[in-house]
């Protein structure tokens, strides 16, 4: 029997893997001093730096240190070695709320209790100027007492991220839960967008399926834009009324959290014991400042400057640790490959999926997109290879964007194009090329004669125009976007 233990920083014993994403793995762990169970998210510095996501990691740390609430998953500490960043998180023994829903819908009493906790946590976030922007059942965890914990703040925004118009402008989130104003690519109020997502979650809790769904993604987005959905007959009148006010396509008239708390359905008493009960339809259509310190950031994120003795950060204070890496008790370094940030912007990307024409006049675009089944690392490797081949200079930008610059000036100066990778599913990505400077004809020629042929071995389908393969593209996306997803519509019979 193998008695070796994996010990991290002389502080935590690492156990089984709990989850995995593109850039991180999450492990169950135990504090060696207190015996407390925790979850440790292990992130590879080099990988996230290479794809321009370090700013997102920093933001997630800042936000999680800013929000302390019983219904928010707690970040206990951040540690670092030369090559890795470790988030020590509260362990949610009950797992994802999504897994519970996938076994069957909840009664309104059970759903109400979870919804109370969700609204409480989100209301607190908003009071601190934090907007989650990726609320969905997969990001809602349960502890051993069935208490809800909002997690995964990788796409969250702080109020200071707003532009001069007071609105956020980054398209984030998971399509089925995203508010219409976010899909429109216009500025939006982060609080109002979160409220919409809470409404979709509430519908899912009580029905067991998504309110806005269609085998055709464009049609699904049209339904979201018009807030067109159907409630089962089993829904109470009070619940239907609340959903109608939350799923209001106009954010200016959408119900606020204080009014949600005063609604008849919300104020009904929830039987705590209802959570122990079993999960249990013509339809009506409704339209309806505690951030990471400078010292911490320097040491954690600038791995090349780290000393041979790693620093452990607890509540912003740095202490030293003699254990530079995660190692086994026999002295050998544990092999922990790390590719989870919780998705990039995954909507309104290709011509076929773009909803902007539902909201505004469409103008000529200078963008080309393709889908691929290759992992992110392979995509970026291919883009770097392509740049070397055609002597394009690479300028890295934030959030997984590479700027490619032509070696010589053209008719309208240097031709520049941005290549951005979006994750649609763990093994399904969309890559967008967008001209940011230079002559359009030169850009189109470069794409047609050089870039497209060079990418043919990783392209699954080009999106939009004559290159698109509509049925294959749409069906492939639909099939892989939400694996083991909730039922898409009300069961028959």
Curated annotation (Swiss-Prot):
Active site: 134
Region (PPI): 365-394
NAF domain ranges (all copies): 320-360
Record's keyword annotation contains ATP-binding: yes
Domain Protein kinase: 12-266
One biological process term in Gene Ontology: signal transduction
Alphabetical keyword list: ATP-binding, Kinase, Manganese, Nucleotide-binding, Serine/threonine-protein kinase, Transferase
A Pfam family annotated for this UniProt entry: NAF
Gene Ontology molecular function, alphabetical: ATP binding; protein serine kinase activity; protein serine/threonine kinase activity
Enzyme class of the recorded protein, top EC level: transferase
Cofactor(s) named in the record: Mn(2+)
SMART domains the UniProt entry points to: S_TKc
Residue numbers spanned by region Activation loop: 152-181
List of residues binding ATP: 18-26, 41
Compositionally biased intervals (Polar residues): 316-332
Claim: Kinase is one of the keywords in the record: yes
Disulfides per UniProt: none
Region (Disordered): 311-332, 465-493
Alphabetical list of PANTHER family matching this protein: CALCIUM/CALMODULIN-DEPENDENT PROTEIN KINASE KINASE-RELATED, CBL-INTERACTING PROTEIN KINASE 26
Domain notes: The activation loop within the kinase domain is the target of phosphorylation/activation by upstream protein kinases. The PPI motif mediates the interaction with the ABI (abscisic acid-insensitive) phosphatases.
Family named by the database record: Belongs to the protein kinase superfamily. CAMK Ser/Thr protein kinase family. SNF1 subfamily.
Role of this protein: CIPK serine-threonine protein kinases interact with CBL proteins. Binding of a CBL protein to the regulatory NAF domain of CIPK protein lead to the activation of the kinase in a calcium-dependent manner.
Protein name: CBL-interacting protein kinase 26
């Amino acid at each position: 029997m193998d008695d070796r233990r994996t010990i991290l920083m002389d502080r935590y014993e690492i156990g089984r893997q709990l989850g995995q994403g593109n850039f991180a793995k999450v492990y169950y762990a135990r504090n060696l001093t207190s015996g407390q169970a925790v979850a440790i998210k292990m992130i590879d510095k080099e990988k996230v730096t290479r794809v321009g996501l370090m700013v997102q990691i920093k933001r997630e740390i800042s936000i999680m240190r800013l929000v302390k609430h019983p219904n928010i998953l707690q970040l206990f500490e951040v540690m670092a070695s030369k090559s890795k960043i470790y988030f020590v998180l509260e362990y949610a023994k009950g797992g994802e709320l999504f897994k519970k829903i996938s076994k069957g819908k909840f009664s309104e009493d059970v759903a109400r209790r979870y919804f109370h906790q969700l609204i409480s946590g989100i209301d607190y976030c908003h009071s601190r100027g934090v907007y989650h922007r990726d609320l969905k059942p997969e990001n809602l965890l349960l502890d051993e007492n069935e208490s809800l914990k909002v997690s995964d703040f990788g796409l969250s925004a702080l109020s200071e991220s707003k532009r001069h118009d007071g609105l956020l402008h980054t398209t984030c989130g998971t399509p089925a839960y995203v508010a219409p104003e976010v899909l429109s690519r216009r500025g939006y109020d982060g609080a109002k967008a979160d409220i919409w997502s809470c409404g979709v979650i509430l519908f899912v809790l009580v029905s067991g399926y998504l309110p806005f769904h269609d085998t055709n993604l464009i049609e699904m987005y049209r339904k979201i834009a018009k807030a067109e959905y159907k409630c089962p007959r089993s829904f109470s009148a009070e619940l239907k009324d609340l959903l109608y006010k939350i799923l209001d396509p106009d954010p200016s008239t959408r119900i606020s959290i204080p009014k949600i708390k005063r609604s008849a359905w919300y104020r009904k008493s929830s039987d705590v014991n209802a959570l122990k009960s079993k999960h249990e339809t013509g339809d009506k259509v409704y339209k309806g400042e505690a951030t990471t310190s400078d010292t911490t950031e320097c040491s954690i994120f600038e791995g090349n400057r780290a000393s041979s003795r790693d620093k452990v950060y607890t509540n912003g204070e740095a202490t030293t640790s003699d254990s530079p890496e995660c190692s086994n008790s026999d002295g050998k370094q544990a092999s922990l490959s790390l590719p989870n940030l919780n998705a990039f912007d995954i909507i309104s990307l290709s011509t076929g999926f773009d909803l902007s024409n539902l909201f505004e006049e469409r103008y000529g675009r200078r963008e080309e997109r393709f889908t691929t089944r290759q992992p992110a690392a392979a995509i970026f490797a291919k883009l770097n290879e392509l740049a070397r081949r055609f002597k394009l200079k690479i300028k890295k930008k934030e959030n997984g964007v590479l700027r490619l610059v032509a070696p010589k000036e053209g008719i309208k100066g240097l031709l520049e194009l941005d290549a951005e990778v979006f994750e649609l599913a763990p093994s399904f990505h969309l890559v967008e090329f967008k001209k940011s400077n230079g002559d359009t004809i030169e850009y189109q020629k470069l794409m047609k004669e050089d870039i497209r042929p060079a990418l043919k071995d990783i392209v699954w389908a080009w999106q939009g125009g004559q290159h698109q393969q509509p049925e294959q593209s749409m069906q492939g996306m639909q099939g892989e976007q939400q694996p083991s997803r909730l039922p898409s519509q009300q069961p028959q019979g």
